[in-house]
Structure formats: structure tokens, C-alpha cells
């Protein structure tokens, strides 16, 4: 009598499991960090519900510039795994969250435990628009969902009260702590709100050191993903104090296309290197002016900061043009309006995402330390 057993077809479909999805995600690498999502601990969900794959990935910054590429790579990897299992998917739903991580290695505990990353914005000379870059970098990161603080470290020439529209805001203290101002989606503090508006601070180095330390340590920052510190020009007391006082993740150096600005920016880069602070990149401010005729005018030369970045082996974080709107928005204390200008929005958004990417890489390497100052 013939057997009634009929073997299953070799090509019959098999269920796609969550374990198989996780294996597929091991082939997806974070383009900046250079490792796969599973090894980096970024995969928070990898479920399969019927014909839907549900995946949650925790990025290292809400301003991740590679989000779309990561999404595409995930979809390709999961679709490939489903095809191998002959499992038909109607949807691959990828959700992104973000957690700005502290560096892996630290020397001692941070004096600001609620602050995850501290970034200096500096320049070797004044007049290059360093504060403009610091303000719009902070606002740009906040627009991506990050919790951001901005500290005005320019003790002798504080400009953040004007650029953030803090003129009518009153300084509030609770006990020994100053309450930061909250405007444009960021927290901020400046010496300019603690002294008379027109008063000149004729202070020697130790007094400037003490004032900066008080602003940094006695402001109730709370929980922040990023604290941006707008440094004064030059390589003097405040940058040294900052590097010794706080564990910096890195620094952004601001330059114009002009040769004299490049010379001083080079000195700023060397200063940070001597302090053991990683330079995240160079940004070119005042790159060009667009006239009413629609033509671009290179008032200070062309591409000088990008060339400087290349010669020093540093990332170039982008170029910001001169526009009447940028000047007006800075003077009126409304940087949010810069995102209504397509050229400025593109420049500042690019600066924010590229800087966030560099911060994530620096934090993952975790190489920074509180420096030992040496003179050479």
C-alpha cells in the first residue's frame, strides 16, 4: 500500500522571526561610528507582527545627519531577510529615538552632572561672527529636539543678551543658583545680564576666571544634551579656565575666508590641541554676500576656511553667507527667524547636524581628559 505522506514543498514560506530581524540589523552600520547597530546597542525593538516588521533605533543625537541612510539600510536588510524566509512584508516601520551619550571614558566626575556634552565655540580673533555661529548652532540643535544650553563666556564683550533678545528679561536667583533664561528653545546665561548694560568690565585675569567659573557652575542648567560655550576671542584666560574646569567633548573653530582670520584660526586650533581638546571642525562665516542682482560677491575671499580645514586635516562644517536678514535677526534678538530664509536655514541646519555627528564620534571614542597645562 502506497504511503499517504506528502513531503512539504522545499520552497514553502517560513515565518520571519524577531531573532532573524536582529541578525539582519547586525549588517547595518552607523556611518559615523563605523560599527553595526546591534553592537552599538542602538536597537531597542525588533518585532515581527504578522506582515509588519517593527523596529526602533536609538540614535546618538536627535540631529543625526545620516538618519535617512540608516533607515534605507535597515529596510534593505530586513527585506533581504524576509525574502530569504519567503515571508511577505507589507510594511517595515522604523522609529527613531535619540539619547545623547556621555563619553565612554572620563577622568573624574563632571562638575555639571546633568550636562552630557560640552562644546566650545572659539576663534583666534574677534569680529568673525563667533557668537552668531554659537547662537545658531544652539538653536539648530534644539530645533532637532535636543536639550541645549548656551553659556556666554565672553566676559569682556557679552553679546548674547542682544542676540537672544534678553533685554527685558530679569535675572532670577534661587539660593546660590542662577536660573537660566529660556528663549528660542534653549537655556542661556550671560555676564551681560548680571552687570549694568553699559558697564565696562575692567578686570584682570583672575577676576575673569572667577566670573566665568561662577556662570558655569552656579547656573541651574538641569538636564542638557549639549552645553554650547561661546568663548571670547584669542587664547587667554577664559579658554584656559574652561579647559581646566569642564570636561570638553570638543571645540568648533570659526573663521572667515580672509587670510588674516585663517592665521588666527590656526592658532586657535593649536591652542585647543595643546589643551587636549578635540577640534570637531572649522566653520566659515561671512562666506559670501548675495546682492539684489542675485550674484554672489566674495567680500573676504573665497573658500579660505575650507582650505584651512583641509590643510590641518580637520572636518569642514560648512559655510554661512552674509545676509541682511541675519544681521537684522541678530540685532533684534530673534535667531529663530533665520530658519525662514532658505539659504540660512540650509547653512545652519547643515552646521548643526554635522557638528552633532562629530560630537557623537568624539563621545564614542571617549578620549578626552582634563588637561595638564604646559608652556612650550
Name the predicted role of every residue range.
Residues 25, 43, 64, 78, ...:
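Residue-level signature of catalytic and energy-coupling elements of molecular machines
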Residues 195-242, 261:
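Phosphate-binding/switch loop-helix module in NTP-utilizing enzymes
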Residues 141-203, 209-217:
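Phosphate-binding loop that captures ATP/GTP phosphates
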Residues 222-226, 247-268:
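Conserved Switch II/interswitch segment of TRAFAC-class P-loop GTPases
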Residues 2-44, 76, 80:
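N-proximal, solvent-exposed amphipathic alpha-helical segments enriched in charged/polar residues
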Residues 118-154, 265, 269:
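Walker A/P-loop phosphate-binding motif and the immediately C-terminal alpha-helix
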Residues 81-82, 95-97, 102-103, 269-376:
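C-terminal lobe/tail of nucleotide-utilizing enzymes
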Residues 39-42, 47-53, 60-122, 352, ...:
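Extreme N-terminal, non-catalytic leader segments
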